[in-house]
Curated annotation (Swiss-Prot):
It comes from the Archaea. Keywords: DNA-binding, Metal-binding, Nickel, Transcription, Transcription regulation. Its cofactor is Ni(2+). It comes from Methanosarcina acetivorans (strain ATCC 35395 / DSM 2834 / JCM 12185 / C2A). This is Putative nickel-responsive regulator 2. The lineage of its organism: Archaea, Methanobacteriati, Methanobacteriota, Stenosarchaea group, Methanomicrobia. SUPFAM superfamilies: ACT-like (SSF55021), Ribbon-helix-helix (SSF47598). Transcriptional regulator.
Length: 140
């Protein structure tokens, strides 16, 4: 079965593309296209994994964001207040003049945790984010 290849155009900051190209060279990719295909496959697998998160969970959302982006700090606070029933704690600190690192510790229903993570992960200005989750452990 022949797979049809589609040609796309993507606009990226030069610094991001340079870093991507260097990573591809270090990892031995034969082309930028193959690296992009691999990155898209990984992104899709992560999304599919997130859709399987169900039931009682303990989780963290860790993110690095550009706090100089207009409105991002207040938007993050607003989103977190919408999910206050899930959030048990958070830690926030400044890693550079314009960048903050935050870890949000959560406990609750998996679907709601994913919903919160999706809202945060998609914000413009979030440079890196990671959802980590595990089934809630009950000790009796």
């Amino acid at each position: 079965m022949e797979k049809k290849l589609m040609r796309i155009g993507v606009s990226l900051p030069g610094e991001l593309l340079d870093k991507f190209d260097k990573t591809l060279m270090k990892r031995g990719y034969s082309s930028r296209s193959e690296g992009i295909r691999d990155a898209i496959r990984t992104y899709n697998q992560h999304y599919e994994w997130m859709q399987q998160i169900k039931g009682a969970r303990a989780a963290t959302i860790s993110l690095v964001y550009d706090c100089s982006k207009k409105g991002i700090t207040s938007t993050l606070a607003k989103i977190q207040h919408e999910y206050i029933d899930l959030i048990t704690s958070s830690v926030h600190f400044h890693i550079e003049e314009d960048f903050c690192f935050e870890t949000i510790i959560l406990e609750g229903e998996g679907e709601k945790i994913v919903e919160l993570a999706e809202k945060i992960l998609s914000l413009k200005g979030v440079k890196h984010s990671r959802l980590t989750t595990m089934p809630e452990v009950k000790t009796e």
